[in-house]
Amino acid sequence: KKQYGAQGRPQGAQRTPDSRLQPLGDLAVTDPSFDANAMQEKISNLYVQMQNCWTDKNIESLRPYFTDAFFTQMERQLNGLKSRGLTNHVDRIAVLGVNLRGFYKQGGDEHLIVELRTRIVDYTVQDSDKKLVSGDRNREKFMTYEWDMCRAEGSVTTREGAMQSVSCPGCGAPLSINTTAKCPYCGRVVTLDEHDWALCAIKGISQTTR
């Protein structure tokens, strides 16, 4: 089975239609501190960190920035590579553009739809002898993705690094959190998607190899 991992779903997925999206100006009505430039920088940095962690085969540090479901999906695919003795290398990473297209609300969540354009070198080798299994060590891939960032509806942007006082959704205990926290009472890990934007899905829109 093909492992898409950090590169998202198979290429050729359909973009979220513009007709479904509200403009970012509407988001500022309920979240006046939302900063589009800061969000673009955050997403750009997260993309690079995500590729590096994927190559290192350790994504634990990404847990606060993913929803539980997306983290589990990524972890399952990474474990598949480990079990077969393979490493997927993602090198020469560059983020060429981050476009915040708009947002929509569904099921009590807000979804921020983001289009990323990136350049990478993507190849997979056997751990035992470094033999190339797939991809190319030299040819560059120019990728277009759609990222879906989500958070609970009604959440507001907090000052960078600020601690938020929240209640554990598992047992109701009070917690202080800026990225992630483990509840000392019930053991649940509270991540940013419950209080701030977290990555919940990736679509691969297009790919060109040069």
Where are these regions (language model features)?
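A short, polar/proline- and glycine-enriched secondary-structure boundary/capping micro-motif
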Residues: 125, 169-171
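Alpha-helical transmembrane anchor segments and their immediate juxtamembrane flanks
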Residues: 1-3
